Amino acid sequence: MKTTVTTSVGGKQITIETGRLAKQADGAALVSSGNNMVLVTATSSKKASELDFFPLTVEYIEKFYATGKIPGGYFKREAKPTNDAVLIARLIDRPIRPVFPEGYRHETQIVATVLSADGAFPLEILASLGASAALHCSDIPFNGPTAAVQIARVDGQFVANPTPQQMEKSDMDMIVAGTRNGLLMVEGETKFISEADALAALKFGHQSLIPLLNAQDELREKAGSVAKRAFTAPSIDADFKAKAESLLRPKIAAALSIKEKQDRYAAANEAAAEAEKALLADIADKELLKQRKKELNSIVEDLKYQEARSMILDRAVRIDGRDVKTVRPIANEVGILPRAHGSGLFTRGETQVLGTVTLGTADDEQMVDSLLGLQKRKFMLHYNFPPYSVGEVGRMSGTSRREIGHGNLAERAIKAVLPDFEKFPYTIRIVSEVLESNGSSSMGTVCSGIMALLDAGVPLKGNVAGVAMGLIKEGDRVAVLTDILGDEDHLGDMDFKVAGSPAGITALQMDIKIDSVSFEVMEQALAQAKEGRAHILNEMEKVMKVPRGQISEFAPRIETIKIKPDKIREVIGSGGKVIRGITEATGVKIEIQDDGTINIASADPEATKKAIAMINDIIAEAEVGKTYKGRIVKIAEFGAFVEILPNTQGLLHISEISNERVRAVSDVLKEGEIIDVKVLEVDRSGRVKLSRKALLQ
């Protein structure tokens, strides 16, 4: 039976419907606002998996029919998800994952399908709402509901779920997700806002999503409040657990006191191997042996979790010996790659990232065929996380969702300081190569990227750095950690990344593993993050603070000239003939914009100079009183037509040919002849009157 509820956020009506579509899924919700509709389904296996983690997958699918379009390409159907679709899938996943009950191991899949879109409402908000609503109304164990809103600030006022027009005027673009208890996820970019403004935006976001939570509760009640299915969480034999913990606890505690990551892992693995030999050697039953091995691995991880957190809360000492606020040692280098246009190596503790910058022309822009039309991107950041960066062997086939997500965060952090395209008309590509990783390689990417941009001579508006904050919370005891290790991310309760400059924040991202985080904790984390990134930025600027005076000798030089818009067609020519001729003659790349801005790119300054001269000749206009060397293109009874400039001809009347009387023009002049003429007049219609006689006097 169809059930519908309607609510409003930010003055925009949102409707959630269930019971009409996709009824064989465990849960389904159709969420709509105006002409925007997203169908979200939730399905969970009835049988528990043997994995030691919760196997949740989220798919976000954009259908081109949603905007009345047919996909491009040969096959004319939707292909693999775009980067934007992957990022939205991650936004759906991140707030719902910590809300599933502990120990639930059933394979679960969320599929969000865009059915209709006009660009007036953020689809990721509808999809996130639909995922929670589908789970909330199903029998799948889920401790929701959750909801998300997009936050902008226009003319000093916060706006929930803004329109594209409002976003153009906004100094922030943040997505906030949570429950009634507090926030679960934050993702956003800002234009140098203060920590106080960021906190105010988060509070506004939390208040704005409450109506969406109420609507889901109403929908569940109206749909019949289906009982949640029972499940059995993995358990460990109590006697075996007691023996294993007694044997392992001191060894795990000793291992966690080792500062170097690989040595620490080796010591923990050795302790686990010794425990396996001591506790499992006499087990003959293969199934029981398999079960006990799984249990032993779980016990080892639990002990790491307990001991690491105890060290921090009881003694204020972290795994690598630091206190809660200290940033790991930092080392920086620039210009280490001779042919790259810019390069920077950023090392913080056992995290090392190589950033490279390549400068290109308009031909190098990324073009993305999206639901709402073709998008052009002049700035790209690609993040690579090879398995060797964590000392492992692994497959290297394509870009992972994690790599796309981390790259996007770093891209948003850096975007705020890039020069305006009008002042620096280059396509910019940053590539981040994570060479070593032990925590916050995405923030390392921000730092190495900035140093590579400075090395490349890009005139940045300022420098930014990033730091990852962590949280350990046990009851009322709380420790906020600056510059977290990989283990602290894994064993902690929060991963809160903040990037910016002394002037303010440019990007932030938060994910938590507990039911919520208070605003007091977030305020403390933002304050510590400000201190941390100021320290990191100071270390970076010891090596390089301002851009190099010029770009790399291997980068294309781009010169910009401005012409009248009505002259553009003359430069392009019929079918592109003229502009093609210029590029073939000089080897340059030419980009023409609608406002008459022309960018000429070449590694050869002489070629650029020649191309500019050719363009100036094409667009030149006849000047009264100026002498030109022209070619006679046509003889008439009353005079001759002379081409004095490309696309510009003037009339040399028979009376202006000579001081002597001329009986016939052909007696004096011939077609193709080159003569000197003077411009006497240019009338309102652009017709040019010439004289040869004036030069003979």
Curated annotation (Swiss-Prot):
The record's keywords, sorted A to Z, are: Cytoplasm, Magnesium, Metal-binding, Nucleotidyltransferase, RNA-binding, Transferase
Residue span(s) of domain KH: 556-615
Cofactors demanded by this protein: Mg(2+)
Show the stretches that span the lipid bilayer.
none
Asked whether the UniProt record includes Transmembrane helix among its keywords, one would answer no
S1 motif domain: from which residue to which, for each copy? 625-693
Q: Where in the cell is it found?
A: Cytoplasm
- Biological process GO terms, please? mRNA catabolic process; RNA processing
- SMART domains linked: KH, S1
Q: Which InterPro entries match?
A: ExoRNase_PH_dom1, ExoRNase_PH_dom2, ExoRNase_PH_dom2_sf, KH_dom, KH_dom_type_1, KH_dom_type_1_sf, NA-bd_OB-fold, PNPase
Enzyme class, first EC level, given as a word: transferase
Its UniProt entry gives the catalysed reaction(s) as:
RNA(n+1) + phosphate = RNA(n) + a ribonucleoside 5'-diphosphate
Q: What is its EC number?
A: 2.7.7.8
Recorded GO cellular component terms are: cytosol
Molecular function (GO) terms for this protein are: 3'-5'-RNA exonuclease activity; magnesium ion binding; polyribonucleotide nucleotidyltransferase activity; RNA binding
The function of this protein is: Involved in mRNA degradation. Catalyzes the phosphorolysis of single-stranded polyribonucleotides processively in the 3'- to 5'-direction.
UniProt family annotation: Belongs to the polyribonucleotide nucleotidyltransferase family.
Which PANTHER family does the entry mention? Answer: POLYRIBONUCLEOTIDE NUCLEOTIDYLTRANSFERASE, POLYRIBONUCLEOTIDE NUCLEOTIDYLTRANSFERASE 1, MITOCHONDRIAL
Q: What is this protein called?
A: Polyribonucleotide nucleotidyltransferase
Its lineage reads:
Bacteria, Pseudomonadati, Bdellovibrionota, Bdellovibrionia, Bdellovibrionales
